[in-house]
Amino acid sequence: AQFIVANCGSDEVARMCNLYQIPYAPGCTTMTEANHSLEMGAAFIKCFPISNVYGPELVNLFKTPTPWMPLMASGGINLDNLAEWLERGVDCCGMGSLLTKGSKEEIAANAAKVRAIIDETRAKMQTA
């Protein structure tokens, strides 16, 4: 595997990923879970489910006391809200069906749109 994204933390998975130097992103919804996962060597913390359950408050929960914490937003991220999540401070976003369903042309077009949104948002954030 190039990286592993999970719905929850697992010390066993973290140890295996560390052994083979595979970036690991466990799903966390509390600061305790996130801190433990980072202590176990997680590359970043997957905030999950973010959009329809916790929303931006989960990003605030993690980033306010620990602004350096690497976060991945996952669950309900789409072309309409991707920029908002990046602006809120997440480092990356997980997307499912947007980049896996449809023809290869549709997937390629969606990937290009995602890339453009990321580039535009990061450029705007650097000049702000």
Please state what every model-predicted region is:
Residues 27, 75, 98:
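Short beta-strand-to-loop elements that line the ligand-binding cleft
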Residues 15-20, 39-44, 64-67:
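Short, surface-exposed connector motifs at secondary-structure boundaries
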Residues 1-9, 22-35, 43-51, 72:
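Catalytic beta/alpha-barrel core
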Residues 8-13, 46-55, 88-110:
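Glycine-rich phosphate-binding active-site loops on the catalytic face of alpha/beta enzymes
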